[in-house]
Regions:
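Histidine/lysine/aspartate-rich catalytic loop segments that bind and position anionic ligands
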Residues: 1-27, 33
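Glycine-rich hexapeptide-repeat left-handed beta-helix
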Residues: 21-22, 27-91
């Protein structure tokens, strides 16, 4: 399911039974496994990957080449790395 005002660039893979809430932005080549849930106002950078059953909280910024291996439950943060770690809050 894809919400309202979601922007997706070319080359993305969205797995089955995934939910993308409103106002999200996906750059190119984002790869989501099945059963993922992306909160509203999330931004996913180039080549970001999310494991199956992954959850991304509202307002999360995932930088390029970041691997989400654990659920991100704290909203409005910037994440980077493989595996992802929180760098700072979104202000």
């Amino acid at each position: 399911t894809v919400g309202n005002n979601v922007i997706m660039w070319a080359g993305n893979h969205i797995g089955h039974h995934s939910i993308i809430e409103d106002h999200c932005f996906f750059t190119s080549h984002v790869c989501m496994s099945g059963h993922c849930h992306i909160g509203s106002h999330a931004y996913l950078g180039v080549n970001a990957t999310i494991r199956d059953f992954g959850e991304i909280a509202e307002g999360t910024f995932v930088s390029m080449d970041t691997s989400i291996t654990k659920n991100i439950t704290e909203p409005w943060g910037i994440y980077r790395g493989s595996p992802a770690r929180r760098l700072k809050n979104v202000e």
